[in-house]
């Protein structure tokens, strides 16, 4: 376990079998150590794991726990190549502003709570820009926290590409809490 209390272990096979790779800090490319990843143990902290090297491709947010097969973290396949610890601010405060248009224009909604459906809660089809005022959040491509994920730290995002998306297709979001 690192000084910050973060640790993640990747296993080649399901149910924590086969070769393993232990990590306690950000790693831009571990696929040379493991040809595939079918299970993970997060023993400390919350982690963002990525399909490709250099924190690229599909991303999955994994809080502390055990994931005996890749379907448990909503993985599309057994390929993972990089990871980074998610650093949560102290104080436990959360606040986000979402906008129906880019550059913080159009209707704005502010919340401090998770949202399983932006259509039901805010009557919006998409999010085109946002300001993360407090905390760390995850945007999801589909309602009920499903689909592609995007990690948002405290800053302003003028357009979807700023949070790593090709389109404004965000249908749900939630806070990362420990």
From Swiss-Prot:
Q: Where is the signal peptide?
A: none
Q: Name one GO biological process term.
A: lens development in camera-type eye
GO MF term list:
structural constituent of eye lens
Could you confirm whether the keyword Secreted appears in this record? no
Show the segment(s) annotated as N-terminal arm. Answer: 2-5
The record's SMART domains line, in alphabetical order, gives: XTALbg
Q: Which UniProt keywords apply?
A: Acetylation, Cataract, Disease variant, Eye lens protein, Repeat
- InterPro entries, alphabetically? Beta/Gamma-Crystallin (IPR050252), Beta/gamma_crystallin (IPR001064), G_crystallin-like (IPR011024)
**N-acetylserine sites (modified residues):** 2
Domain Beta/gamma crystallin 'Greek key' per the UniProt entry, residue ranges: 6-44, 45-87, 94-134, 135-177
Q: Where is this region: Connecting peptide?
A: 88-93
Claim: Repeat is one of the keywords in the record:
yes
Domain comment (free text): Has a two-domain beta-structure, folded into four very similar Greek key motifs.
Job of this protein: Crystallins are the dominant structural components of the vertebrate eye lens.
The entry describes its oligomerization and partners as: Monomer.
**What family is this protein classified in?**
Belongs to the beta/gamma-crystallin family.
Please name the disease the record associates with this protein.
Answer: Cataract 20, multiple types: An opacification of the crystalline lens of the eye that frequently results in visual impairment or blindness. Opacities vary in morphology, are often confined to a portion of the lens, and may be static or progressive. In general, the more posteriorly located and dense an opacity, the greater the impact on visual function. CTRCT20 includes progressive polymorphic anterior, posterior, or peripheral cortical.
Q: What is this protein called?
A: Gamma-crystallin S
